[in-house]
């Protein structure tokens, strides 16, 4: 992994917030591998969502809370056991109920022919505690 890879991965992390806040669900294909996992098992009643189509459907369930603002910060890209991992913090503001939520993403990212993609994203909410 070189500096160019790190910049591309950071751009991927930035696009995530825009994609989740946008009604344009085609952006999801620029984020996840076809068999990607969006894992919210750390949330109350959450379960993993497997595959791009299922992730799009998951986002559609959140549409009533739009507009929202997903922000990703403190992005740390590192190699561990031969895999590329990303650890970052997130801030989510939902104007509909004036709530702010904070948490962490722990990602496994892979290089595909189309660029870097998220293979597995574990979402943990830290504030408010669930």
Model-predicted segments: where are they?
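A beta-strand edge to alpha-helix "cap/lid" segment located at domain peripheries
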Residues: 60-130
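Short, low-complexity N-terminal intrinsically disordered segments enriched in polar/charged residues
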Residues: 1-26, 30-34
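Charge-dense, low-complexity intrinsically disordered segments
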Residues: 3, 46-49, 96
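Alpha-helical elements of Rossmann-like donor-binding domains used by nucleotide-donor carbohydrate transfer enzymes
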Residues: 15, 54-57, 104
């Amino acid at each position: 992994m070189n500096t160019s890879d790190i910049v591309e991965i950071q751009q991927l992390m930035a696009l995530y917030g825009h994609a989740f806040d946008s009604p344009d669900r085609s952006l999801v294909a620029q984020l996840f591998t076809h068999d990607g996992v969006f894992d919210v098992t750390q949330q109350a009643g959450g379960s993993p969502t497997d595959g791009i189509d299922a992730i799009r459907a998951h986002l559609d369930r959140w549409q009533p809370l739009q507009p929202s603002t997903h922000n990703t910060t403190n992005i740390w890209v590192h190699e561990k056991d031969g895999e590329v991992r990303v650890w970052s913090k997130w801030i989510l503001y939902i104007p509909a109920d004036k709530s702010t939520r904070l948490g962490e993403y722990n990602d496994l990212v892979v290089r595909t022919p189309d660029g870097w993609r998220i293979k597995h994203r574990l979402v943990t909410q830290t504030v408010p505690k669930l």
